[in-house]
């Protein structure tokens, strides 16, 4: 009787070992399918949208900061907002966002191309320099000449949104 019980235990042990190996093989198969099927990845990529800034209908290349103000602005503007901006001081364009968003102002000296939040509800784009207390939102990647021709006007129209 002891021999029969011992034989059954050995068979059960081998059966359990076989189950654990097939589990690993299924896991490996899933990993292989993930790497061999780029369709899933590209489908996800195509669903992602890009947050775009346009000045007078010209798309500008901007590098956004990673902060709460930018996150809130992007969430607010994801369906698109249009802001009429007015030149101020001969070095910046200023326009109301239309709502108050989180700010973390600090005394900074801006450079041409800097995009900042002022008073938690206004966006400012610089084509000159200034020192004041702002929350930096980003920087437009253009040279001084390009910024001047785009922004050195009495008014510009700024559009923000996902595309």
Give each language-model segment a name.
Residues 119-120, 159:
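Residue-level recognition of conserved beta-strand edge/terminus positions
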Residues 69-119:
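Mature extracytoplasmic domains of secretory-pathway proteins
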Residues 138-163:
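Well-ordered alpha/beta subsegment
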Residues 15-18:
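C-terminal motif of bacterial Sec signal peptides marking the signal peptidase cleavage site
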Residues 45-82, 91:
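Extracytoplasmic/periplasm-facing segments of secreted or lipoprotein envelope proteins
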Residues 21-52, 57-59:
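N-terminal, intrinsically disordered, polar/charged segments of Gram-positive cell-envelope systems
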Residues 1-4:
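Positively charged n-region of N-terminal signal peptides that target proteins for export
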Residues 127-142:
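Short, compositionally biased
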């Amino acid at each position: 009787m002891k021999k029969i019980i011992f034989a059954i235990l050995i068979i059960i042990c081998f059966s359990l070992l076989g189950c654990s190996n097939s589990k690993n093989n299924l896991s490996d198969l899933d990993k292989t399918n993930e790497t061999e099927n780029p369709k899933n990845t590209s489908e996800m990529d195509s669903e992602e949208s890009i947050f775009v800034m346009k000045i007078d209908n010209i798309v500008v290349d901007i590098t956004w900061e990673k902060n709460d103000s930018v996150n809130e602005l992007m969430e607010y503007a994801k369906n698109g907002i249009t802001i009429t901006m007015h030149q101020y001081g001969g070095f910046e364009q200023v326009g109301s966002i239309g709502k108050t968003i989180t700010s973390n102002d600090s005394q900074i000296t801006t450079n041409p191309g800097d995009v900042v939040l002022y008073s938690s509800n206004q966006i400012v784009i610089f084509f000159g320099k200034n020192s004041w207390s702002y929350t930096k939102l980003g920087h437009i990647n253009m040279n001084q000449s390009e910024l001047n021709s785009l922004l050195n006007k009495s008014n510009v129209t700024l559009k923000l949104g996902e595309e």
